[in-house]
Amino acid sequence: AIDKRIKCVACQVPLVSGFRNIQRLVRQDFLAPNRAAMDQDRAARFRGEPPAMVPVVDPDPLAVSALPTPDSWEWFSKTGKRRAPAWNNEVTLRSIEMLMEYEPSAHLERISPTPLLMVVAALDHLTPADLALEAYQRAREPKKLVLLPGGHFDAYVKDFETASGAARDWFLEHLGSSG
């Protein structure tokens, strides 16, 4: 949105509002304890201590994790492990705190006249589809929406050909071919 050297934008199962996303993913009664843990982590890092780590996923949806959805557990514990066997199930608590402050949709109206493609999964609960569709409505032309039938991780497996094909076609249309 800010760098006009960018000739086109494609986003797939986008996170459009970190704050609203966290409000959906984390139970309300967990927010205050999570905030307290983040405050303690920030103070510890200031003292030179290592950052607090939390699991990315956990089979228990009530346990502390960065991505507390069943499809996240399925993806990272099975598909992700198969594709990236060296992956460690941990992320800094600071990363979650920074996610809460990440608001890319604040710039959405300023992307135009750069062409925008949004690939949204209709059943996405990790980066909620309704938030992405709301953001798409706010975006100005030129824009295009591709709605996938599945959930968040289906964009990388079951619906990969559709998602990646849409991005490829978008880039070819707006960037041309180099061959």
What is the meaning of each model-derived region?
Residues A1-F76:
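Alpha/beta-hydrolase-fold enzymes
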Residues M100, V120, H125-L131:
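Conserved alpha/beta-hydrolase "acid-adjacent" motif
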Residues A106, L133-E134, D169:
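Active-site phosphate/pyrophosphate- and oxyanion-stabilizing loops and adjacent acidic/basic residues
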Residues R24-L25, E90-L108:
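Active-site nucleophile elbow and catalytic-triad environment of alpha/beta-hydrolase enzymes
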Residues A166-S178:
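C-terminal alpha-helix
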Residues T127-K144:
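Active-site-adjacent alpha-helix of alpha/beta-hydrolase-fold enzymes
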Residues G150-S164:
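Catalytic histidine-centered segment of alpha/beta-hydrolase-like enzymes
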Residues I111-S112, L117-V120:
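Short beta-strand/loop motif that positions the catalytic acidic residue
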